[in-house]
Amino acid sequence: MRLPKLLLILCLCAAGPAAADPLDDALAASRKGDYATALRLWRPLADQGNAVAQYNIGYMYDEGLGVPRDDTAAVQWYRKAADQGHARAQSNLGALYERGEGVPQDFAAALQWYRKAAEQGHATAQYNLGIMYGTGRGVPRDYAAAVPWYLKAAAQGLAVAQYNLGVLYGEGLGVPQDFAAALLWYGKAAEQGYPRAQNNLGMMYARGQGVLADYLQAYKWFGLAAQRYDESEKQSRDNALRNRDVAATRMTPAQIAEAQKLVQEWKPRSDGSKP
């Protein structure tokens, strides 16, 4: 099974409601693109041990926002925040260890930092920990061990984790094969606009796996997938279009028109939770 690329969510971290004014002022400046002011305000706080400021400076170096991109500096600042239990810093530090950016590549260290963040409920870290088990990075490949972490991330609405669960249930990897469960998880990711899930959901409707065969629904999901693949995924988009056209051979003109209308009217929706 080919799993998607690692998903790294990097976002500037706001302080809580009782935060000191400089944190809020720095965040406001960063949102306006005034990274020099943000860095000037965050730096003394970070030097005093403020984990939020440390994380945000790490992010600026990670992304090259207002400073030259510097993975080594990003690692240093993320580590300061991570050592204080900052979950996003732990997750991003794990990703840098996994990719070998700013530090020598070290899957064991990546696993350690992902786990720290995952145990705090960080959805991206939970997903990445599942990836580590599912691909055998730093640990023996173990789909069964990946499943609980994907479930935790999926329960928080992370579409790529929902998609991976669909794959595992559909293929019977780490869990008994269960087309109904695969359909459920593909559906959750598809409704959020994740194109791989949309294509696979279309395939399940076309094949009648976990549901009665429904070519109208298959056409709809194939069509939506084709629309949402980006330019770097031309082959996947072309495959979705071919799948849609095959489904169309089993449909009446009226059904095709109805399916096309569904595609036009469809809008992605959140499942009500955020990672």
Stretch-by-stretch model annotation:
Residues 22-29, 41-45, 56-63, 67, ...:
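Hydrophobic face of amphipathic alpha-helices that form TPR/SEL1-like repeat modules
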Residues 227, 233-275:
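Terminal, low-structured helical/coil segments at or just beyond the last alpha-helical repeat
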Residues 29, 33-34, 47-50, 63-65, ...:
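Short helix-capping/linker turns of helical repeat alpha-solenoids
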Residues 2-9:
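Sec-dependent signal peptide recognition
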Residues 15-17:
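N-terminal signal peptide c-region/cleavage motif recognized by signal peptidases
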